[in-house]
Amino acid sequence: MRATIVFQGQILEPDAFERRVLRSAAVLRSVGIGEGDVVAMLMRNSPEAMEVMVATRHLGAQWCPVNWHFKTDEVQFILADSGAKVLIADAALLSALGGLQTGDAKLWTVRGSVPEAAAWEPVRDAMPSLDALPAAPRGAMFYTSGTTGRPKGIVREPMTPAQAEASVAMRRAAYGIESPLRALLTAPWYHSAPNGFALGVVLDGGTLYIEERFDAERTLRLIDEHRLTHAYLVPTMYVRMLALPAPVRARYDLGSMRFVSSTGSPCPPDVKRAMIDWWGPVINECYGASELGYMTLLTSAQALQKPGSAGAPLPGVVLKILDDNGRELPAGTPGLIYIHQPATPDFSYVGNAEARARMEVGGLKTMGDIGYLDDDGFLFIVDRKADMVISGGVNIYPVEIEIALQGMPGVADCAVFGIPDDEFGEALAAAVQPAAGAVVTADAVRAWLSERIAGYKVPRIVSLHAELPREDTGKIFKRKLREPYWAGRARNV
């Protein structure tokens, strides 16, 4: 916990950060938080988010980051489904959620106050530090979008000592963490990858510069001014920085950077090459999942040799390509990607044992991605068996959007799917079949959805169809809707 946190020009030195973590742990313990309990966190990137996360980990409890773009109903579901005993929320975010019912969960706010909740900081500062050894860490309870239309909560088993040691090695490989380091966090910490990046820096005793949101030129300025060494960025951020005028890009010295980690969505080879040409051989890409951890790593040198690859398995990782019958496929033959990552404790889904069981074959687990290994053992991802869309590094399952849209008057049926986007990797498109005699417009569709789901889930493209293409079974033929958008692309994700 000997980390330094820098936020909005204020420096939280290691002694002060450790004191706040142990006082936060004492507050949580005082309301009954212990091993296996859940602390929900509706918080923007901030020092308070880091201290509550580490305090929860210290108690062997699970921190449950909540996407701050979610609407009231979405937050309500996660609170109820996770069984969270505590919700700590940014006051501004909580105020924007009208009618949120927290049930029996204890509610605190940070960075402001609201009438219905106590402010966190005064309670924390008045509490003596917890004097107790840390419990076995359980990790975060991330909610990952699911094909049922509701997200699934990931419940981790406690880490064994061997897994704890292996997880340190995994984070160091995936994020390039090595002391001393000065790291930059600009991606939303509620996603598993930036969350793991921030946690790794803090546990390693590094200096973490926290930004509430990403800004292309400000990122360059921070690297230059503070001689930052590490960052977690996603391809969308690369695109935005590359779009800056050449004189702006040339203004900043980025030579201090040693390791940039990227994951979430595939990085187009031309974007990666442009970043390597600009920043040098410090651009790295991982393939991973909230459930399974990091699986592969692709360095800059490897990216230039094998454009389009997702990398080679990390040390200790078992990666196999299997057919639908569980048979291993030879190099060059696409199939389902199955993984075993020994650094990641086993998990279950809250109330969904069936979905968890479907993932596993012979001790290996799959997220439903389709790919192949080349003769050198490098992974190439070519498609997804599931319908998940990754836009700007965010996982989105269309079924949730389809359920919301099917409730719109005048809509007979619909299909939501991913289409290529140069900035975000993928964008959402909706194909809508109006009911007989109904008048439905694209603007009306977007307005309907905007009132019911987070803004990033609202499709950018809405097309209207007299009849949607269907398979013999009557199921909508999404592939026929997607294909025209992906024509001429090297891959379909």
Task: Identify the role of each PLM range.
Residues 3-46, 50-54, 71-76:
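Conserved AMP-binding/adenylate-forming core of the ANL superfamily
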Residues 162-182, 186, 190-229, 244:
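Conserved AMP-binding/adenylation subdomain of ANL enzymes
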Residues 49, 70, 87-89, 221-223, ...:
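AMP-binding/adenylate-forming catalytic core of the ANL superfamily
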Residues 13-16, 139-165:
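Conserved AMP-binding A3 loop
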Residues 38, 44-64, 68-72, 81-86, ...:
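A short helix-loop-beta submotif of the ANL/AMP-binding
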Residues 30-31, 54, 58-124, 131-134, ...:
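Structural core segment of the AMP-binding/adenylate-forming
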Residues 140-142, 146, 203, 229-232, ...:
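Gly/Ser/Thr-rich phosphate-binding loop
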Residues 125-143, 149-150, 176-182:
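Conserved pre-ATP/AMP-binding loop-to-beta segment of ANL
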